[in-house]
Amino acid sequence: MSSRYTPSEMAQALGAGLLSFPVTHFDADMAFDEPAYRSNLDWLSSHPAAGLFAAGGTGELFSLTLDEVDRAVRAAVTQTAGRMPVIAPAGYGTAIAVAMAQAAERNDADGILLFPPYLTECDADGVAEHVERVCKATSLGVIVYGRANARLDDVALARVAERCPNLVGYKDGIGDVERMTRIYARLGDRLLYVGGLPTAETFALPYLEMGVTTYSSAIFNFLPEWALSFYAAVRARDHATIYRELNDFVLPYTVLRNRRAGYAVSIVKAGMRAVGRPAGPVRTPLADLTEDEFAQLTQLIGGRR
């Protein structure tokens, strides 16, 4: 089996709806709980997301072994059974990222989300070379994740896009409005644009005006119907609904999220526990919410489950 999508078809499919970034399940001994992960993917994929990103940031890529990444991707491909594109991660240094991209292709993923290089300083030209090498190592469509040290400006991104037809997307986790505006102004419909800031619902409406038609919804993990409804309001530019839900739920949620570094992932697993779908603890160096914070989150979720 191989990808059912060409790179451009994959990008088009992802841009048409909300994106699912599932957590990775761990047991009490911090081992990857693949049966629980597969069961949760069955549940998640029963909701109409446009694509599923296995072992991404919300899935604690940074805490997984490469073997666990492969297992998570293979499980996602199997459990979704063609209902949506499955996007696999690639990251760290260029050699490892190339190996991960090639493994994703062997595991029948439909595309690659390319994470920033690991623990090194680099300029836009260096990042561009990194992205180009990964793109040329696979036939899958690649979405580059602009975040941390992976800061491509519009000129560098356009150069890579010209050289690599399978570079089909840019995910913005930087939040620089001028940079995003320049990228969209230069590249337009050449790329898919994905909102990737933590709790992306916060920024979904203004980002839509910059050509960003979709985003990674961590909240989808525990409130999929709410997340899909909010996304529909964004695409309809229903300001009244958007700002009601921002004030009543999203912004108070971000207050809890901001209590501690790394809570952007931890709070998602806490949310799953709150709705009766526990996924186990987060792996170190992250920390789980305190019981008091968990109680506050449970109260905030309320009847939205």
Curated annotation (Swiss-Prot):
Task: Give its E.C. classification number.
Answer: 4.2.1.41
Q: In which pathway does it act?
A: Carbohydrate acid metabolism; D-glucarate degradation; 2,5-dioxopentanoate from D-glucarate: step 2/2
- All disulfide bonds of the chain are none
Keyword Lyase included in the entry's annotation: yes
Q: Keywords on this record?
A: Lyase
Provide the reaction this enzyme catalyses: 5-dehydro-4-deoxy-D-glucarate + H(+) = 2,5-dioxopentanoate + CO2 + H2O
Pfam families linked to this entry? DHDPS
- CDD domains (UniProt xref): KDGDH (cd00951)
Gene Ontology molecular function: any one: 4-hydroxy-tetrahydrodipicolinate synthase activity
Name the InterPro entries for this protein.
Aldolase_TIM (IPR013785), DapA-like (IPR002220), Dehydro-deoxyglucarate_dehyd (IPR017655)
Q: Which GO terms describe its biological process?
A: D-glucarate catabolic process
Which PANTHER family does the record cross-reference, listed alphabetically? 5-DEHYDRO-4-DEOXYGLUCARATE DEHYDRATASE 2-RELATED, DIHYDRODIPICOLINATE SYNTHASE
Family membership noted in the UniProt record: Belongs to the DapA family.
- Name of this protein: Probable 5-dehydro-4-deoxyglucarate dehydratase
List the top taxonomic levels of the source. Answer: Bacteria, Pseudomonadati, Pseudomonadota, Gammaproteobacteria, Lysobacterales
